[in-house]
Structures are given as structure tokens and as C-alpha cells.
Amino acid sequence: MSVFLAVDHVHQVFDLPGGGQYIALKDVSLNIRPGEFISLIGHSGCGKSTLLNLIAGLAQPSSGGIILEGRQVTEPGPDRMVVFQNYSLLPWRTVRQNIALAVDSVLHDRNRTERRTIIEETIDLVGLRAAADKYPHEISGGMKQRVAIARGLAIRPKLLLLDEPFGALDALTRGNLQEQLMRICQEAGVTAVMVTHDVDEALLLSDRVVMLTNGPAAQIGQILEVDFPRPRQRLEMMETPHYYDLRNELINFLQQQRRAKRRAKAAAPAPAVAASQQKTVRLGFLPGNDCAPLAIAQELGLFQDLGLSVELQSFLTWEALEDSIRLGQLEGALMMAAQPLAMTMGLGGHRPFAIATPLTVSRNGGAIALSRRYLNAGVRSLEDLCQFLAATPQRLRLAIPDPIAMPALLLRYWLASAGLNPEQDVELVGMSPYEMVEALKAGDIDGFAAGEMRIALAVQAGAAYVLATDLDIWAGHPEKVLGLPEAWLQVNPETAIALCSALLKAGELCDDPRQRDRIVEVLQQPQYLGSAAGTVLQRYFDFGLGDEPTQILRFNQFHVDQANYPNPLEGTWLLTQLCRWGLTPLPKNRQELLDRVYRRDIYEAAIAAVGFPLITPSQRGFELFDAVPFDPDSPLRYLEQFEIKAPIQVAPIPLATSA
């Protein structure tokens, strides 16, 4: 359906009297369809009324825009009508005269008879015929609000804006007016946006409920689709379990935001913190292509230029790296994309340990390789693999670096898309990337999913060929991220910004083909890729099929297309996959978890420090290769459509404290 109203990357900043600024709204985007009823909810100070005023044209956004039917909103207009909590009726005019004032002012191009007809029809529409000639002091509060709504509808607006219209009314009157408003909007075909604190009101009236995060810098945290058919009956809705599922979703979001506000207040650093922030930082990594920005920032002095002394420590396994983080032997690390989420939740029976990621360091860069004997058997595609496995009782033994590693998650997704159950039809073996090539040569495994370094070495040795790259499954996926302990980040935010700034500059160099020789020279040092650097960083990718190597653009992605943005939308997808394969329940408190892990504020400060433009990716979903749409606001619905999955559980997850 076409877009009627678009809120396009809106920022709203207010200057403070004593200097400084207050960021009310930050990068808010929303598309509204014709005839849709949208409710905005969130705690006080989250910018609900600010957003409503921007849509009304009563204020202009600091950046971004409001687009109504293809035209930018720059001022109030008769196509929009605002109904406030206070009725704003003229006390010396009757109900009819208050409505007529709006009609005569706006619809002055209509003749007198037409205007009178509109007034009388509107009086009947809101059920005020008996009170048409009464003055405001002669009618109840509920009737006054109906007059305000009638005045709004009488000018035939395309968009009705309501700012807590029933907040001051008693429960009975409020309930009656809610049902009347629902009927009126449906009969008139009006598009409506309403601010409310009442979750039951939002569910009754809305097609979608937009949940805003805490201010300052409020954003859209989640959008809930209310899929009850219309016309709606309150009691019928409340008798269904689905109603309470939706209600709990709203309340859960608000509770998470309340906890986030308390946590932010408790974690606010003392004014003297900046001067005493740590400048010597130990960072861990596993050698591979993904460590290129880390190596470049270190060897070209980008960390040092920003006053940092960085010590890099390499590890053979992800378990060893995680142990060093937990023991306080590292201040941060180049981590698997899902690792900050997993550590903060305490996956694998570990104690929850809060990790934040302010930067995605690399994207893509992996593949799925099989032993060459399967190439000789004619396995050149996923379909071929399915046919081969159907004809033999053999189960493939496929090595993965870690159950939560992106190569493992993409491998599972890829297999399941063809009807292969990764828990039954193949055997997944956890293995250090260092061991994979030799294990394949020895016949201990039939293939593996890993980064380009291991793939290239296996192909060069004549032991493997590539069946698929991760670009074939999810182009642009997050691969490695900068992970920092939350407790350390709270007292060293400026150091974290400097780390990110250096890595941003390094990522830009790594994505510049003119810098290839320079990068090879750095990475061929023994602590990084060593002698394998020349093979791994060759310009063309060898699939091991006997064909000429192929150039694959963005096989490794370190900078272009907002590659470094720490995207909570991608984090939601990661949570669905961890849940899909039984590694964790789908967290009911996922918004709280995502807000803690994905530190976009640090990223944005680093972007500003480096001077790169701040361009945020879309936050409204995506598809992998199988074209199954992923909606970040409905992760459970996304999971339920897959036939191959572990039993799905949804539960609140106890999160780590910062200490």
C-alpha cells in the first residue's frame, strides 16, 4: 500500500537557555499508510508530543523532514487537525457555533448551504444533536472532547492528530469516547496519529503502536502490529489470549525503558572521569582477514596518533579470548558478531558478563568449503548436496569455529533453507579455525564454514572447493565487532571513542584497493597472517573448481555502505537464530539487551571525531537469499514460519550487571 505520511530521518534539537542543546528526537523514521491509526507511546520526555507537533507543522525538525502525500510539511494546514487534551472551546459559543467556527474558517470556498450541511452531519456523527445549542459550561467533559473531535473532523482533514485526548476524563467516559473515536475514524476513513500513555487505549484503537525509547535522543524502539480485525469490540478483544500477548509486549517495553533510565542515571560518570581515562588498552583477536583494521590501526600509528597505547594479543580459540575478557586481562577484543549478546546473556552456562559493541569492524568474508571428493561426486550446489545426502546414509561432518559464530549461523540457515536439518542431517563439529585445514586433509571432517583465510589455504592445498560464500547467503552481514566490557566503557568513554576513531580510519584504508600492497605488507607480519597474507589477500577469489579465480567485490567489507554501524536490527536477527537452534530463549527484554549492547552513541561520537558523514542504515527489516522477510518488530512471527527449528521459547533473560 502507498505511503500517506513519511517521517524521514527526523532529528529535533532544542537550544538551552544557558547554552548547550537538548536532543529530543534522534533519527526517527516512520511510514504511515492511508486510513491507518497509529499510537505513540513511551515514558514522559520521550518526544511523543514533539513528534506530533512536527507532523502538525507547528514546528520544524532540525534535520530530516515530514512528507505528507509527497509534499514536505513546512507549516500547519487544513489537511491536518490537532485535538488536544484540553478542549480549547470558546465559552461564549454553543457546540454548533464552535464547530461552525472551524468550518467557516477553513472551508470558506464552500457556499453557506454546504457548510451548514457539513456542520449538522458532523454533529450527528459524534452524537451531539441533543447538545448542539448548549454552551461548553452546560455539557460534560466527555461531551466537550467530542466537540473538539467534531471540530477537527468537520474541516475534512486527511490526518487527525490527537495528543492524549482522553487523559483528563474519568474511566467510563474515556471508554465510551474511545469506542466512538474508533467508529468515527473508521466511518470517515481518516488517518490518525495519537499520543497516549494508556496501553489498552492504544491496542483498542491502533493498527500499529509505535514505542519510543527514553529521552533525550529518543528513537523508535519497536513497532507493534495490532492485527485484530475491524470493527472491534473491546470485550471480544479482551477475551482472547492474543490481546494479553500484545499488551504484555507493550508493558514489557515500557518496563525495560524504566530500567534503562535508572541504569543510565546510576552509570552517569563523574565530571572528573575524562581526565583520568585509561590510555593503555589491551585488545584481543584471532588472526584472519577480519583483523586487518586492527592491524592497520596499530602498525600505521593510528591508535598512537589519538594518544592511545594499544597492545594486541592473539588467541587460538574464541573460548580463550572470552576467558581473558572475563578475567580482566583485556580491555576489549575483536569479537564474533553475536559474542557481545551471548556474553551479556550468559550463554553456554557462563555467568552473564556485560559487553557493549560500539563498532562493527568487518562484514562478509566467509565461505562454506567441502572436501574435493564431493566435487568429484558432482556436488556443486546446495541442491546437489541435498540429492547426494538423500542417496547415502552418510552424515557430513562440518566444522564450525563456534556455535554462535556467523559462519555457523549462516551455515545452519543455508542448510535449513533446503530442508536439511543441521541438527540431524549433518554433524556440526566445533573446532579452532587453526585446525580446520589439517582436519580436512586428514579426512576427519568433510568440510567447514570459516573466514577467507582458512578457505583460501584449503583451496590452495588442493583439499577443498567452495560451495557457497556468505555473499550468497546474506550479503553485508556483520562478521566481527569491537567488544568492550560495559563496566570499562562507562568510565572510559573517550578512550572508546578514540579506539573507534582509529578503527574507522583503518577500515577506510582497508576498503581502498590502492592500499592493497600496504595492507599485505602489514598483515604478513607473523602476529597477523604471516606468510599466508599474499595468498589470502589476492585480488581474485579461487573457488577451487578449476576455473579462473573470480573477482568478488566486497568479499571483505570494512568501511563502505555504513559497514561500521553497530546495528541493533542485525542484533535482533542474531537473537532469532540463537533461539532457532536452541541456544537461548528469545528474550522478552530484547530491547533492553539491544540498547545496552549496541552503543550507537559511541559510534556517532567517533564518526563526528573522524569527520565522516553520519548515515544510518534502514531499521525496517531485510531479507536473506531465500527472500523470507525479517521484521525486527516481530521476531517471534519470523521464527514461527520456519519448519526446521528447535522448540521456540520466549522468556525474560537475566542480564549482566556492569560491575
Swiss-Prot record:
Region: NrtA-like, residue numbers: 279-659
Domain ABC transporter: 5-239
SMART domains the UniProt entry points to: AAA
Entry's EC annotation: 7.3.2.4
Localization, UniProt: Cell inner membrane
Activity regulation as described: Transport is inhibited by ammonium. The C-terminal domain of NrtC is involved in the ammonium-promoted inhibition of the nitrate/nitrite transporter.
Main subcellular location: membrane
Residues noted as binding ATP in the record, renumbered to the chain: G42, H43, S44, G45, C46, G47, K48, S49
Catalyzed reactions per annotation: nitrate(out) + ATP + H2O = nitrate(in) + ADP + phosphate + H(+)
Domain of life, per lineage: Bacteria
Major enzyme class: translocase
GO biological process terms held by the UniProt record: nitrate assimilation
Membrane topology summary: Peripheral membrane protein
One GO term describing the cellular component: plasma membrane
Sorted UniProt keywords: ATP-binding, Cell inner membrane, Cell membrane, Ion transport, Membrane, Nitrate assimilation, Nucleotide-binding, Translocase, Transport
Record note on domains: Contains an ATP-binding N-terminal domain and a NrtA-like C-terminal domain, which are connected by a segment containing an abundance of glutamine, alanine and positively charged amino acids. The N-terminal domain is required for activity and the C-terminal domain is involved in regulation of the activity.
Protein name: Nitrate import ATP-binding protein NrtC
